[in-house]
Structures are given as C-alpha cells and as structure tokens.
C-alpha cells in the first residue's frame, strides 16, 4: 500500500486507532467532572438551570463514553495482533498495569454508570450524586493507569531483563517513573481544558442563533472561567514537562527544537519556524531568536540544549514531524490563553454574550483542545522513536510478522469501519448539541421513583380496575 512495508503500515494503523480513541477519553474525563459539578450545584441551590444542563450533557457524555469503550477495546487487541514482539518483551509490566485499570477504573465506571444515566428519578438524590462522582473518579483512575504504562515506555525503570524479557523488580518505580507525574498532570489538565472549549463552543453556537437562555449563558460562562484559569496553568505544566523531557529524552527535545549543532561557548537559539531536513541535517528557512532556546529550556544563558548531531543517525526521531506538531500544540495553547483573557475583558465590559466576533472565535476554538491533544501525542510518540520502550526495545523489534497485503487490507478496513461507525456517533452528538438544553421544568413532587416502582404502580392500577 503506497509502497509501505508491513512495519510502517502497522505503525500507521496503530496511530490511526489511537488518534480516534484519545478524542473520546479526553472529553469523557472533562465531562464527567463537569456533570459532578452541575449536580452538586443543583443539590445545593435547587436552581433548575443546573438540572437542565446536567440532563443535556449527560446524554452527550453517554454517547461519547460508549464510543470510547469500543475504540479502546480495538486498540488493546492490537498489542497482540500487530505488536506481539512488544507484548512478549514487556507484557509482564504493561499487562498488569492495564489489568489494574480494568479492575479499579472500568469496574467503577461500569458499576455506577447505569445509576448515573438512568437513576435520576429512581434513586435518592444523594445516591445519584454519589454515582456521578464515582464515574468521574473512575475516569481519573483510568487516566492514572494508562499514563503510568505509557510513561514507563518513555522513561522505563524498576525492571530487569531476564532471558530477553522485562521482569519487574520494583512496582513503585515502574508506576512512578520519572515522566509519569508530569504526563499525568499534562494530560488530565488537557482533558479538562478540551472539555471546557467543547462546552463553550456549543454555547457559542446557540448564542449566535439567539438562543440566549439562562442555561446556555451559564455553560458559556463556566467554560470561559475554566479556560481563563486552566490554560495558563497548562502552559506552566508543559514547561515543567519539557524540562523533565530534556533530562530523560534529550534527543526528543533536540528534534522539537529543530536544533542540529551547538556553537562552542554560545547559548542555544530558539527556532520559531523552519523546516528540519533529516537528509541534509539542518533546518532550512529557520527564523530564530538568539539565546532564547537556552533560556526557555535550561532557564539559564550559560547552558546549551543537546543537538541532534550529538546522537547517532539511527537514534534520532523524525524532527520534521515533531518540530511542527509541537508548534501546533503550543500555538493552540496560546490561542486558548487569549480566549480566556478576551472573555475576562468582555465580561468586565458586559458584552460577553453579545460580542458576535468573540462568539465566533469561541465557536472556532471548540475543537482546538482535541487538536492540541493529538498534536501533543504525536510529539510524544514520534519523538520517542526509534524506540517503543525508550533505550530498551526498538520499535522495529516489537512488530508482529505480517505480510504487506494483510496489513494494507486491515488498515483500509479500519479506515472504512471507523469512518462509518464513529461518523454516525459524531453526527448524533452534534444533533444533541443543536437541540440545546431544554427549558428547566419544576421538579416532580413526591419521592423519587424506586427501582420497583413500575411493578408497584402496575399492581395498584390493576386493583383500581
């Protein structure tokens, strides 16, 4: 297929399925916590606006959660079908970590999801709120275990190699490896930020069409407060994550910077734009700021950033991809900070809900969080190459033995099936968003209907005959 061998087709297939999958957990994590906040506000204030927003977003959450589960299962199977070399080599670590995720997070989510989605008038309000909080907690726990596994692949420790296989010797070191805290914070905050932008864009769409209800205004306001607070925090977390990467994966940082060689005694410049050329080993058309690279990455003007030529050619990641994926992520992050700042200014001026240029800006920024997450993961995963377990196992040694034709057919099948199934799912979510929150109705009088209320009501109805 397109002149690619089975190895590269397997990489493309996994990148395709992962890219589809990551979108759903990112929104699920943020929406679950958002729903917990909405229900908490409803219980505290009895303001029907919060109840209306809860019912509106819980439907979208349910669709998104279902698609995330399906896409995640397919991705997990690929460890055995396409990457059996990796599973055989490192399965004693990645297998238990994924099992812990199922036992602690997925069971928690599955156990309380039904109560959360269908128990509003069937269980008491306290129990229902508890169920919503447990689902939100489950998404965070799931993030914990998944990122522990991925971070171990980036900065492996706590293991020995015995008879050509990884054997864990210190599970605390395996889980809390050097990059894990930064990656967990960075991804979790990215999920909250992406969800805020998603919610804000949905509200902006309704405001642009004159749907200026209290519920729409409330979710727009909440989303922009979240963006204002979280976007700058995310930038600071990203800076800390970058310093950690500089320490443990210097070749990745060199590729991100498009930096090929140092001049003795001079600080490293910051390349704003350019085109890293892997064949000529230089960055063409570079626009740079002297010394700023050293200042940002080492917080000093006396230190230099590692250069790509300091690493063997076979150990360098593809700088062209990593250079631009990082800049896409960082550029979108700056726009998010700008969005939050403009919202604060317009809020002060009393024009937050009436400025049509700003509403259009908020609408167009809706997918920016998800795009930034995808760009960030491209930076992370392509920047790790040519290793699947950094410095321990090469990606070429991890792939299963498949023919080029078989991989081509399976890749095309994935593209068609994913495009069809998840296209329908996305379309349905957009239909739900277009409907908007329903006007708040006064709560029903009396006690909530219990699980056996249907049978009881039926028996009473028969007696009335």
Label each residue range with its predicted role.
Residues 1-465:
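Polytopic transmembrane helical bundles with strong interfacial aromatic enrichment
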């Amino acid at each position: 297929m397109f002149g690619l061998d089975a190895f590269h087709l397997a990489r493309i297939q996994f990148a395709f399925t992962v890219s589809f999958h990551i979108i759903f957990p990112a929104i699920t994590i943020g929406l679950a916590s958002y729903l917990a906040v909405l229900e908490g506000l409803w219980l505290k204030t009895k303001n029907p606006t919060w109840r209306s927003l809860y019912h509106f977003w819980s439907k979208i959450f349910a669709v998104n959660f279902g698609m995330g589960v399906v896409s995640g299962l397919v991705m997990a199977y690929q460890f055995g079908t396409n990457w059996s070399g990796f599973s055989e080599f490192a399965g004693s670590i990645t297998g238990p970590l994924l099992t812990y995720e199922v036992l602690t997070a997925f069971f928690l989510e599955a156990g309380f999801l039904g109560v959360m989605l269908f128990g509003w008038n069937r269980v008491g309000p306290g129990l229902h709120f508890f169920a919503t909080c447990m689902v939100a907690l489950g998404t965070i726990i799931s993030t914990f275990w998944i990122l522990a596994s991925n971070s171990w692949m980036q900065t492996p420790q706590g293991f020995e190699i015995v008879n050509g296989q990884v054997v864990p010797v210190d599970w605390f070191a395996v889980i809390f490896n050097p990059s894990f805290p930064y990656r967990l914070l960075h991804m979790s905050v990215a999920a909250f930020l992406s969800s805020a932008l998603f919610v804000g864009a949905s509200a902006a769409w309704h405001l642009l069409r004159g749907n200026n209800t209290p519920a729409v205004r409330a979710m727009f306001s909440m989303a922009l407060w979240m963006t204002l607070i979280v976007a700058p925090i995310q930038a600071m977390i990203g800076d800390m994550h970058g310093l950690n990467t500089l320490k443990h994966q210097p070749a990745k940082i060199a590729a991100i910077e498009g930096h090929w060689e140092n001049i003795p005694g001079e600080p490293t410049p910051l390349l704003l734009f350019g085109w890293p050329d892997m064949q000529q080993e230089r960055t063409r058309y570079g626009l740079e700021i002297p010394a700023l690279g050293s200042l940002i990455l080492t917080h000093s003007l006396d230190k230099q950033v590692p250069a790509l030529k300091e690493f063997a050619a076979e150990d360098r990641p593809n700088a062209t991809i990593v250079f631009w994926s990082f800049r896409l992520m960082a550029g979108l992050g700056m726009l998010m900070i700008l969005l939050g700042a403009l919202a604060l200014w317009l809020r002060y001026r009393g024009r937050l809900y009436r400025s049509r240029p700003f509403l259009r800006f908020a609408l167009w920024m809706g997918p920016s969080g998800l795009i930034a997450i995808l760009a960030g993961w491209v930076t992370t995963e392509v920047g790790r190459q040519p290793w699947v377990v950094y410095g321990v196992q090469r990606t070429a040694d991890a792939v299963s033995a498949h023919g080029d034709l078989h991989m081509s057919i399976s890749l095309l099948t994935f593209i068609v099936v994913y495009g069809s199934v998840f296209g329908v799912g996305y379309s349905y979510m957009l239909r739900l968003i277009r409907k908007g929150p329903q006007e708040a109705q006064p709560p029903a009088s009396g006690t909530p209907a219990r699980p056996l209320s249907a049978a009881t009501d039926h028996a009473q109805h028969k007696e009335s005959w």
